[in-house]
């Protein structure tokens, strides 16, 4: 009889290499926020992948960057602290881009860890196969990797193969979570991330990092409908106008798109009510950051 494998795996990489796309691909639900804006993951989101022979808990860490404010400091601490808690590390890179200073910074950080490190070259659907080996050789000059696997998280190419390879390095162990549990975050947090994702998709470059979303109330009104009330926080009045849009059109579209995904998540009809409020310089206010759900790990 095959032994059951279970373990915790950290997905690390510089911003926008496809970490959240990978997470959502293997879990099969939208757990991690996806956007073309950098630094969209603010918390280590645990996604639980359960198969007959294994259960893998993925930690989607914030993209590595130089912090510019207290929220950025917290994002970096989350990323680094995660490395000490896990059984394997996925270092994900964009195979379509040259090795950047961010990649070098991460590899310097990973050189001395004793945990198995997998180099996962994502977005192979965007490059010619002949370009793959030269890129792999470039990374091998920096450090030795446990395994090197090219994938496309968006298209699903080679993802199952990578999971099979990863499982061989995980310890034998029990299921930590029930079969139907896909995340350890409360539903309110995932709902707030869905709303934030839609805002990122619909707003300009000025807005993304100044956006915070808090679910104020989420109640089941009856067997068929859940009521969700959420507040969108921005840092300036001008940003509030951008999020609301002319005649409220932008906010209405955010609500429409978010409601669709929230209904998929909850398996129920959703009544979604959104407000937009200005909270000046909120990313530098520790208590407010904590209130938003970005809670620092206790020693």
From Swiss-Prot:
Q: How does the protein's chain sit in the membrane according to the entry?
A: Peripheral membrane protein
Q: Which residues form the Era-type G domain?
A: 5-172
Any one GO molecular function term: GTPase activity
Q: Where are the transmembrane segments?
A: none
Q: What is its main location?
A: cytoplasm
**The keyword rRNA-binding appears for this protein:** yes
Region described as G2: spans on this chain: 39-43
- PROSITE patterns linked: G_ERA (PS51713), KH_TYPE_2 (PS50823)
Coiled-coil region(s):
none
Q: Which HAMAP family match?
A: GTPase_Era (MF_00367)
What PANTHER family would the database entry show?
GTPASE ERA, GTPASE ERA, MITOCHONDRIAL
Q: What is stated as this protein's family in its record?
A: Belongs to the TRAFAC class TrmE-Era-EngA-EngB-Septin-like GTPase superfamily. Era GTPase family.
Q: What is this protein called?
A: GTPase Era
